[in-house]
Amino acid sequence: MFLQLFSDCSMRILVYGFGPYREFHDNITARIVRSLPSQAGLKKIIFPVRFQRRQFIDALNRHRPDFVLGLGQSSRKRIEVESRAKNYRRASKSKPWRPILKGKPKSLPTSLPIDPGRWAGISTDAGDYVCNYSMFVLLEEIDRRQLRTSFGFIHIPYDFDHRKACRIVDRILRKFALLRVSEQLEPAFTRLRA
């Protein structure tokens, strides 16, 4: 199990998901986060679905993780690893697009390898809601402060089988933890500055 790997290498991991929103009263990401065993070195957070920069920055400051994995619910057909966050948001279809942070790049890459394995696809579009917002805010903060934190984000279909989703998240976490331990997974800021 990936948690044993984390405890063996003193790695600090932050895994986050989101609570209910709109018509979704049961967010699959909250269930997955709650399913992860509690252990030293692993912090689990379920954020409210809000465009609130402070909640994400506070979590980064409080836990100082080596690796952050965000989980978001989607209407897609398969699990997808996000490769970048875009610097725009839109709270609803009736509201105009606007930048998350003015004067910042149009997009920022995550620090995960391009190939997540056969159990997930790659996405270049994290949407325009709070998932993308959290990604951009955290990646920009990691870059601005040149933190040694690796970052990744996974979108999970809302109707995906919960047990299967937990197994896939576990595999992805193990894969990325092994890469980080072997120093093949760079901190996010080194990729942002490449």
Where are these regions (language model features)?
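N-terminal catalytic or cofactor-binding beta/alpha core of small enzyme domains
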Residues: 2-129, 138-151, 157, 162-177, ...
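Active-site Tyr-X1-5-Lys
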Residues: 134
